[in-house]
A protein has these predicted regions:
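N-terminal loops that bind phosphate or other acidic moieties
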Residues: 2-162
């Protein structure tokens, strides 16, 4: 995974473009995580399991010094350029403080950008898989968010089946 060139030990971002139909993907995804390696691994899993598409995904993961943590300013710096390239942006956060940082970042965005960004309550990995697949086939932000949010119920039904 690429490293932030301004800070090799700091948070990384990575992105892709749609390959499935030649059309641009309308929704990008931001992974907000306390751990850069967790976000990179989750993205790697999504890309390996859903190989027919390549969705723009950016990481807002870890702190500039390489420590665990989240930073609302970093989230904003990742969301804004992604929102410039996509019709909508879905954020997925790993844990409570990540959610708080993502909510703070939403408040820091310009209204024109904020209107096109949504924070999902979906589980991090399962939500990413659902969102990645839905975004990869060109679904809009509401549909991508619904796919991510439905991941928890799908997992719950699998677990209760045993």
């Amino acid at each position: 995974m690429p490293v932030n060139p301004a800070n090799p030990a700091g948070p990384a971002t990575t992105s892709g473009t749609a390959q499935s139909s030649g059309a641009p993907v309308s929704v990008g995804i931001v992974l907000v995580s306390h751990s850069r390696s967790l976000a990179e691994s989750a993205l790697d899993l999504a890309r390996r399991l859903i190989v027919a598409v390549d969705v723009p995904v950016e990481l807002a993961a870890g702190l500039a010094d390489g420590a665990l943590g989240t930073d609302p300013g970093l989230i904003v710096s990742v969301v804004e350029p992604l929102a410039d390239r996509c019709d909508g942006v879905l954020m997925l956060a790993d844990l409570g403080r990540g959610i708080m940082s993502a909510e703070m970042a939403l408040e820091m965005l310009e209204p024109a950008v904020d209107d096109r960004v949504r924070l999902s309550a979906a589980p991090f990995v399962e939500g990413l898989l659902g969102a990645y697949g839905a975004a990869g086939i060109g679904k809009d932000l509401a549909a991508v968010a619904a796919e991510a949010d439905g991941a928890a119920e799908a997992k719950r039904s699998q677990v209760s089946a045993f």
